[in-house]
Amino acid sequence: MVFQLVCSTCGKDISHERYKLIIRKKSLKDVLVSVKNECCRLKLSTQIEPQRNLTVQPLLDIN
C-alpha cells in the first residue's frame, strides 16, 4: 500500500511515482525522468518516507 502524495505547490498527485520508488524499488533517478515539474521533483527527492504502520496511533500531548 502506498499513501497518497500530493505536491503542495502545484497540487499534482505524485502517488504513482512514489509507488515506483517504494514498491517497484526503482531508483530515484529513473523515476525523476518522467516528472516534469520542478516542485514535484523536489518533493519526491526530499519527502519520500518508507511505509508506516498506521495501526499504532501517536499519542497527543496537549500540555
Swiss-Prot record:
Keywords: DNA-directed RNA polymerase, Early protein, Nucleotidyltransferase, Transcription, Transferase, Virion
Annotated compartments: Virion
Known catalytic reactions: RNA(n) + a ribonucleoside 5'-triphosphate = RNA(n+1) + diphosphate
Coiled coil ranges: none
EC number: 2.7.7.6
Family affiliation: Belongs to the poxviridae DNA-directed RNA polymerase 7 kDa subunit family.
UniProt function note: Part of the DNA-dependent RNA polymerase which catalyzes the transcription of viral DNA into RNA using the four ribonucleoside triphosphates as substrates. Responsible for the transcription of early, intermediate and late genes. DNA-dependent RNA polymerase associates with the early transcription factor (ETF), itself composed of OPG118 and OPG134, thereby allowing the early genes transcription. Late transcription, and probably also intermediate transcription, require newly synthesized RNA polymerase.
Subunit (UniProt): The DNA-dependent RNA polymerase (vRNAP) consists of eight subunits encoded by early viral genes and termed according to their apparent molecular masses Rpo147, Rpo132, Rpo35, Rpo30, Rpo22, Rpo19, Rpo18, and Rpo7. The same holoenzyme, with the addition of the transcription-specificity factor RAP94, is used for early gene expression.
Identification of the protein by name: DNA-directed RNA polymerase 7 kDa subunit
